[in-house]
From Swiss-Prot:
Protein's job: ATP-dependent RNA helicase involved spliceosome assembly and in nuclear splicing. Catalyzes an ATP-dependent conformational change of U2 snRNP. Bridges U1 and U2 snRNPs and enables stable U2 snRNP association with intron RNA.
Record-linked SUPFAM superfamilies: P-loop containing nucleoside triphosphate hydrolases
Naturally occurring in which organism (per UniProt): Aspergillus clavatus (strain ATCC 1007 / CBS 513.65 / DSM 816 / NCTC 3887 / NRRL 1 / QM 1276 / 107)
Name assigned to this protein: Pre-mRNA-processing ATP-dependent RNA helicase prp5
Gene: prp5
List of residues binding ATP: A601, K602, T603, G604, S605, G606, K607, T608
Length: 1192
């Protein structure tokens, strides 16, 4: 119902002004009447005066309380109901007078009359503005504006007896109306029961229960009666027991009631549900206050109910005056204790909650009218009670019809109900039932509800979503739809991204790079005055520095001449670097001048500091890094150990210069390195493989090379060999072209120089002490021994070293060729009592790092390693290096021996050679000669023997430098190992790619075999002549022939020469047109090679013949093998045979100086022939030649 100035706040907002004005006007008359009548505080007072009296009660006027007690004493004559009223009065006194009615609504105690006086005024305003004129006209004349004393005397009877009589008359009238309403509701209920009869057999039992309870006034869930506000005689109670008795007779006898208090059944509450719907609120509105007060544990265990307005609703319903309440049923307390069966809580979130909140608000408004006279209470609450009772009747019927399982007793057992089933049932019922007009009307009223009243409703709606989220069908469908269908696609994408570790090529013409400064060096005056001759003599003094290039700066002699900052000079002084070394004195000015540099110097000569100091100056000149910008200085190394050592050398300078460096290498967790790079770092020390991984990680968002302007390649010869050169060049291609690039190494073969110069621009080459020279401080010992005597000799060397007390803290490093040999030697030395460890590429990176740290710290004195530790390992106490297995080339020997004798210290390098390793003796002897040491006689014999074999063509001279075996071989080995693991621990997913590859390879072989069979069949179709091949085996053994030479002791008689020539001609004519496999028909003459082989290609398809004869493929083979390839003979169609004087069938002649070169060339030609045959077979299969029909 709409109210004028309606507000849910206790403060009189709507009518305060008018009420107070009328109260002041009538104040004198009111005091006079109160003096005339001692009962001046009775309820027949006008609303205006009562409103004024409330203010006085709050301040100092206390006679009101006495009159209230007197009024309650007057009620005590009623007997049983007076006890109820006494409890209500006590509750009122204990209630808080706070302004927050919402707090009162959610309060857990049942004391509800804290704002009695305010509620009087609120109810008074409500009744004044009510649209219900019918009830208003029936009120006493004391409600009118006429305040004459006669009306006051009439409205305020002097004795209780006439008032009680008037009350009885009105109750009789209300009973008649109630009976008429019950009949109307019974008819409506029967109609709805007939509509719900189609629900099936499960509802037939419920219909019986409904029919049984149809005669009871409690079936429609009317409001439980509350004690009337005025006293009454005991006479009407007898007739008011009948509805209760009827209700008890209609309800089935409880078979196993669950008692809470005396006879109160525990309501069934969904355990998992966090909220109650409006149906629960409607049903629980029937609970009397007595039942609630006797069962505090139930509501306290569900204290969140108060947040949804349910607790307040129960209290309010127990208090409010209704049409039934004013009837005064006799033992109404026992009636209150009887609980009705609760409906199943639905999971609706819309209309019903709003209705419940609004009805709760209405109930509270009705509560406020209790302080008035009984007539005013009844008139004000009648309309609300009728609406509420009708709505509760309909909702209870709806809830009962929705019950799937009938209850056999009147009580409700406390069982946990399945929420999902309840939700489904209630959804069906909501669809079946039409929208009730009263519900629609109350929904409209809910729009005008103040925010305080709707707060509980909003909270209820938020909570109510939880069961839907857990058990809703729609969410389940969504969860099923996501992720399942595309799982294979995601895995395929992930595998594809994982396999493709590639970085995009940058088009530098389209990128705008920031300008930067390279040149920081200003030549000091004393160096500028130095002549060229003086500079040359200075370089000669500094270990014979050799320079190549244009405008090479003169070498410096002091750190102060390098143009460094104060911080860098302080660090250098703190580290104890007195003066620059030879490579530093020449390299630092050259790099600081902005030039590209190739620096070659002996091991342990300070090359690392030579490129680090200019880099710090280079970085500090540029602006700081922004977020997600890559490094400025990039240092690449071939091994992880060298990367960690360079990073360690950087640290003293980083803190002083406020720079950051990241060491990125394989084997370590990449996530840590990604985190460091995202935080920002001006310097990155890395290995090429891990750097490519980082550049490709996360679609290139981890780091980039746009800010890189200073690049260092340490151990550059190893970086540019066959293994690392593709990776290094891929990284270099993504760096700006005008960068400054520096290359350093202790060894730099000539064949590596051409590759390195591709990455440099007009470089300055600085060589100190030779390209690949062992430092003169190292004593080199080379011994030729059998394999079984090497270990005994090793024990002897170690024993001699550690027998001297001066070498107690010495370290020994033993190099072997293979990882298995390292572990085997470790086992043998441990048995002999030497504490040692091994390090090689097969170990985890963390083990390698910890092993080197322990070795440097002296935890164990002996370290067994492969060549992975040959570069960059710097141990000051290392005095002995043993090459247990001889190094396979000069550079490796130099680096191995260079682990000792560092920074001016002395050391010893012992090398064991076996008779089978004479190939490696050449490089070792060369190293001994270049370092000024004598070559042992056994070693020299091995060198001479090997050189003779090379001249005879039996051996091939070993190439200088690290001729790496390439990354493809490593990838193949890793893939093979991974495939073995996958086959061993197969889960059904991993092996699919490998199986597909195997299938493809099998299909290719099958196609080739088919094509080859056609070639063989064509050859077999030809007439068989002597020497014609019956089949060609491209995968078979290659036959290489030595070229025939004239006998040394031939006769000088001309007739003999003529005879031999004639015989040769006849022999050749007899073989005309015939060429057996591997036998040439003409391979003589001055240009003939020492070895030759032939390959007939006449009967192969045209694509196959083209593959082995086109100029591009032949040129590649010629460059790779150094052989001569000639196409000879003539092509003959299948089935045609060359005549006696005709050329032989088309074939290829391969000539070379060594058998190995010819074999390699033949193998490559056979591979091309095989690929061409397969391609021809595929094209024939795709486009068959000829049609289906022939023209006759």
């Amino acid at each position: 119902m709409a109210r004028h100035g309606d507000t849910r706040s206790p403060s009189p907002v709507g009518s305060t002004y008018s009420s107070s004005r009328r109260s002041r006007r009538d104040d004198d008359r009111y005091e006079k009447s109160r003096r005339e009548d001692g009962r001046g505080h009775r309820r027949s007072r006008s609303p205006e005066r009562r409103y004024r009296d409330r203010d006085r009660d709050r301040e100092s006027y206390r006679r009101r309380d006495r009159s209230l007690d007197r009024r309650d004493d007057y009620r005590n004559d009623g007997g049983y109901r007076s006890n109820r009223r006494d409890r209500s009065r006590d509750r009122r006194r204990s209630r808080d007078r706070g302004d927050d009615r919402d707090h009162r609504r959610r309060s857990r105690d049942r004391d509800y009359r804290s704002r009695r006086d305010d509620s009087r005024d609120k109810a008074r305003r409500r009744t004044d503005d009510s649209a219900d004129l019918k009830h208003k006209s029936r009120r006493d004349d004391s409600r009118t504006r006429d305040l004459d004393s006669k009306s006051r005397d009439t409205s305020k009877p002097s004795t209780p007896a006439p008032a009680a009589q008037t009350e009885d008359e009105k109750r009789a009238e209300r009973l008649a109306k109630l009976e008429a309403w019950k009949q109307k509701q019974a008819a409506e209920k029967e109609r709805k029961q007939r509509e719900a009869a189609a629900a099936g057999g499960a509802r037939s039992i419920l219909e019986e229960i409904d029919r049984k309870s149809g005669l009871s006034p409690a079936v429609g869930s009317p409001k439980s009666p509350v004690t009337p506000t005025t006293d009454a005689t005991p006479a009407p109670y007898a007739g008011k027991f009948d509805p209760k008795a009827i209700k008890r007779n209609a309800a089935p006898t409880p078979s196993a009631p669950l008692v809470l208090g005396n006879d109160v059944a525990v309501p069934q509450i969904a355990k998992a549900s966090a909220t109650f719907s409006s149906m629960n609120n409607h049903a629980q509105a029937n609970k009397p206050a007595a039942a609630l007060s006797t069962a505090p544990s139930t509501l306290k265990s569900k204290r969140n109910v108060g947040g949804f307005g349910l607790g307040a609703k129960q209290v309010a319903d127990a208090e409010k005056p209704s049409a039934v309440k004013t009837l005064g049923f006799g033992e109404e307390e026992s009636t209150r204790k009887k609980l009705e069966r609760l409906p199943t809580p639905p999971l609706e979130d819309g209309k019903d909650e709003t209705v419940a909140a609004d009805m709760g608000a209405e109930d509270e408004d009705d509560d406020m009218q209790d302080g008035e006279t009984e007539e005013e209470n009844a008139a004000a609450a009648r309309a609300a009670a009728e609406r509420r009772e009708e709505r509760l009747q309909n909702e209870a019927l709806r809830a009962q019809s929705s019950e799937k399982v009938p209850q056999t007793n009147g009580d409700v057992e406390m069982n946990d109900a399945p929420i999902q089933a309840e939700a489904e049932n209630m959804e069906v019922d909501v669809e079946e039932e039409d929208v009730d007009p009263l519900d629609a009307f109350m929904s409209e009223l809910a729009e005008s509800a103040p925010p305080k009243k709707t707060f509980g409703t909003k909270f209820s709606k938020a909570k109510e979503q939880q069961p839907e989220a857990m058990f809703g069908d729609e969410n389940d469908v969504d969860l099923t739809a996501v992720g399942e269908g595309d799982a294979d696609d995601f895995l395929a994408i992930a595998n594809k991204a994982k396999k493709k570790k590639d970085i995009p090529t940058v088009n530098h013409e389209k990128v705008e790079y920031e300008p930067f400064r390279k040149k920081f060096y200003t030549e000091p005056s004393n160096l500028a005055q130095m002549t060229d001759e003086e500079a040359a003599s200075l370089r000669l003094e500094l270990d014979g520095i050799k320079v190549r290039g244009v405008d090479v700066p003169k070498p410096v002699q002091k750190w102060s001449q390098c143009g460094l900052g104060v911080q860098a000079l302080d660090v250098i002084e703190r580290l104890g670097y007195e003066s620059p070394t030879s490579i530093q004195s020449q390299a630092i000015p050259a790099i600081m001048s902005g030039r590209d540099v190739i620096g070659v110097a002996k091991t342990g000569s300070g090359k690392t500091v030579a490129f680090l100091i200019p880099m710090f100056r280079h970085i500090k000149d540029q602006r700081p890094l922004d977020n997600m910008e890559g490094p400025i200085g990039l240092i690449m190394t071939p091994t992880r150990e060298l990367a960690t050592q360079i990073h360690k050398d950087c640290k003293p300078f980083l803190k002083a210069l406020n720079l950051r460096a990241v060491c990125a290498y394989g084997g370590a967790p990449i996530k840590d390195q990604i985190a460091d790079l995202k935080r920002g770092a001006e310097i990155v020390v890395c290995t090429p493989g891990r750097m490519i991984d980082l550049l490709a990680a996360n679609a290139g968002r981890v780091t980039n090379l746009r800010r890189v302007t200073y690049v260092v390649l340490d151990e550059a010869d190893r970086m540019f060999d066959m293994g690392f050169e593709p990776q290094v060049m891929k990284i270099m291609a993504n760096i700006r072209p005008d960068r400054q690039t520096v290359l350093f190494s202790a060894t730099f073969p000539r064949n590596m120089e051409a590759l390195a110069r591709k990455a440099l621009t007009k470089p300055i080459e600085i060589i100190v002490g030779g390209r690949s020279v062992v430092a003169p401080e190292i004593t080199q010992i080379v011994e030729v021994r059998n394999e079984d005597t090497k270990f005994v000799r090793l024990l002897e060397i170690l024993g001699n070293l550690y027998s001297d007390d001066a070498n107690e803290d010495a370290r020994s490093l033993i190099f072997v060729e293979r990882q298995e040999a390292a572990d085997a030697l470790l086992r043998e030395l441990m048995r002999k009592g030497y504490p040692c460890m091994s390090i090689h590429g097969g170990k985890d990176q963390i083990d390698r790092d910890s092993t080197i740290e322990d070795f440097k710290a002296g935890i164990f004195p002996v370290l067994i390693a492969t060549s992975v530790a040959a570069r960059g390992l710097d141990v000051k106490q290392l005095k002995l290096v043993v090459n247990y297995d001889a190094p396979n080339h000069l550079e490796d020997y130099v680096h191995r021996a260079g682990r000792t004798g560092r920074a001016g210290n002395t050391g010893t390098a012992v090398t064991f050679l076996t008779e089978e390793q004479e190939r490696y003796s050449v490089d070792i002897a060369k190293a001994l000669k270049q370092s000024g040491q004598q070559v042992p006689e056994p070693v020299q014999k091995m060198v001479d023997s090997f050189l003779e074999k090379v001249k005879a063509g039996k051996e091939k001279a070993s190439a200088s430098g690290f001729g790496g075996k390439g990354l493809e071989r490593l990838d193949q080995e890793r893939d093979a190992a991974r495939n073995r693991e996958r086959r061993t621990y197969k889960t059904g997913e991993e092996g699919e790619d490998e199986e597909e590859k195997e299938d493809k390879a099998e299909k290719a072989d099958e196609r080739f075999n088919k094509a080859l069979s056609s070639v063989q069949s064509a050859a077999a179709a030809a007439p068989t002549l002597p020497g014609v091949p019956k089949g060609i085996d491209l995968d078979g053994k290659i036959t290489v022939h030595r070229t025939e030479k004239d006998p040394a002791g031939t006769s000088k008689n001309p007739l003999d020469k003529v005879g031999s020539a004639v015989a040769d001609i006849h022999a050749r004519l007899s073989r005309a047109g015939v060429m057996r496999s591997g036998v040439p028909i003409d391979n003589r003459g001055p240009d003939a090679g020492a070895y030759h082989a032939t390959l007939e290609i006449n009967d192969f398809p045209q694509k196959a013949r083209w593959a082995v004869t086109n100029r591009t493929n032949v040129a590649k083979i010629l460059e790779a093998t150094g052989t001569s390839i000639t196409t000879k003979g003539s092509f003959y169609p299948p089935g045609k045979v060359p005549g006696p004087n005709e050329n032989a069938k088309l074939y290829i002649l391969v000539e070379g100086e060594t058998e190995l070169a010819v074999t390699n060339a033949m193998r490559e030609l056979m591979r091309l022939l095989k690929e061409g045959t397969i391609a021809a077979a595929d094209s024939d299969a795709r486009a068959p030649v000829g049609g289906r029909y022939n023209v006759v």
